[in-house]
Curated annotation (Swiss-Prot):
<keyword id="KW-0946">Virion</keyword>
<comment type="similarity">
    <text>Belongs to the mimivirus R457/R459 family.</text>
</comment>
<dbReference type="GO" id="GO:0044423">
    <property type="term" value="C:virion component"/>
</dbReference>
<protein>
    <recommendedName>
        <fullName>Uncharacterized protein R459</fullName>
    </recommendedName>
</protein>
């Protein structure tokens, strides 16, 4: 029996530790002050911006309106030389660009950035042809409008002048044969003891 008895049940410290570890999560769930933070008090900011114009610039940058609309990194953040970027008389520059683009060139108001984006001429996918039967040459669809008779490889020609009877009546002297299941059910009902 050596090694099977650990005396843990007699160790008060170990028992308290086990109890604390098993009950603390429930106490946290039941605690009414678990979302209260003592540092969560309205305090004035120590750093103040010198002018409200910087706040507008920061907000414009956070909204992304000071960048041109492109997902290409080189178009969003183009490389500008010392004399600024592309000039406004460049034919690649759109006539209605964001006014923030004019701030990127560092040599005057005429220095702007272009994304060199081109107008797409194709949507990027092709739709299937809606006239799928147009180019068929089998018996079903080949010259279907011009042929007077309906033809098919497994059917014979049906003349248009022949009339097919729509209703056929059962003569009164012949009885209608009931299905076998109905006959068995009827026999079982008749053979029941009352």
């Amino acid at each position: 029996m050596a090694g099977s008895f650990t005396r843990k049940m007699y160790d008060n410290c170990a028992t308290q530790q086990t109890t604390k570890q098993s009950t603390d999560p429930l106490e946290l769930l039941l605690d009414v002050n678990k979302y209260v933070n003592c540092n969560n008090i309205c305090k004035p900011l120590a750093q103040r911006y010198p002018s409200s114009a910087q706040l507008v610039d920061v907000e414009s940058s956070l909204w992304g309106i000071d960048k041109l609309a492109s997902r290409c990194d080189s178009s969003k953040h183009p490389f500008c030389a010392k004399n600024g970027c592309l000039l406004t008389n460049d034919p690649r520059i759109a006539p209605h660009i964001t006014p923030y683009a004019c701030e990127w060139g560092h040599t005057g108001d005429n220095s702007v950035v272009t994304t060199n984006m081109k107008m797409p001429s194709h949507p990027g996918y092709t739709l299937p042809n809606p006239n799928i039967c147009k180019d068929q040459t089998n018996g079903y669809y080949h010259n279907a409008v011009k042929s007077p008779n309906m033809t098919g490889p497994q059917h014979q020609v049906i003349p248009q002048h022949q009339v097919v009877p729509q209703h056929q009546t059962v003569p009164q002297h012949q009885s209608v044969i009931k299905p076998k299941a109905d006959q068995l059910r009827y026999q079982n009902i008749q053979n029941r003891p009352y």
